């Protein structure tokens, strides 16, 4: 049998095992597993935002807003809502953007084993079927630009929005993977500063 044939058989076997193991865990067990994951990821998410979610720049608020707008466009995200007067902007895109596929896998390599470890006491071997699939999700980034002493304070938050039900029999978590959040924030800030430099607003 060809390599592709073996791969197809293994995928079918994995699907059968997933269905079988899903039947061994009650909805209450699955809910408890995702609740535990959400609690852990929420703590990581809030710590990440406190550390990386806010920066201050010696630029005018209007210049920062324009640079943010360009940043999200360069990263392949759609501007869903904006209010230049208030300094707020919302961008979204199909997951894994603003990460690329390689960056998403990098996040999954760190966060997926931890997620399975958290879920395992509640659902047993079903935890091994948990995936960090980007399908059926959109990433939403909220940005705000406020006047600060001699410049502007820029803040970022992120969340996931479901556009299709998960392919597995597990409910979705509410919080994005912590490593994914870190990579996304770092990427946005890098692009934002490139836009400011291109406009000669910062050295």
Residues of each region from the PLM?
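Bacterial N-terminal signal peptides that target proteins for export
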Residues: 2-14
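Ser/Thr-rich, low-complexity intrinsically disordered terminal regions
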Residues: 25-203
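C-terminal motif of bacterial Sec signal peptides marking the signal peptidase cleavage site
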Residues: 20-23
